[in-house]
Amino acid sequence: MKYSDYRKNIKAGDVIATSHRAKWYKSWYDLKISVVRAVTQSEYSHVGLVVNWGERLMVLEAVEPFVRIYPLSNIVNEVGEFYHVPMPFKIDLTGSGAFDYALGKVGQSYSQIDAMRSVFTRLKDDAKWECAEYVQAFLKVAGVDITDGIKSTPTDVVLALMRLGAGCILV
């Protein structure tokens, strides 16, 4: 499915997930992600939050070296495909304070150690982030707590949202 045709279905508050299924390793990053996917036996290697910035769809995400706001179209150009995880219910981004909360984390550090640790245990609350932990924290402020009993991996986030009725569409 072409992103340009599907784009209209993506709304603020939705989650995107990527798999990063590179057949050829172009960088050290490609190799690291492939190793993580193999060890965790996960389909998903990354998650982020969709927000609107005027007419643009942007993604709030925790990546090396910090939490950032990044155009979804750039992610599409870089990874080729992604999964759209539409929320099965309306999320109040502004009234709940979730949007301000997420924006307040922009520029904070990404923790590669936390990303590795998240496979085995729940993460402690600190000022360093990994992608799934960031999405979970945002959703909790928005009134959707998916932290109970799950670890902070991209796959855990996607599966928890699917249990609540979210879809998962390959774009």
Whereabouts are the PLM-identified features?
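Cysteine-nucleophile amide-bond enzymes
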Residues: 1-171
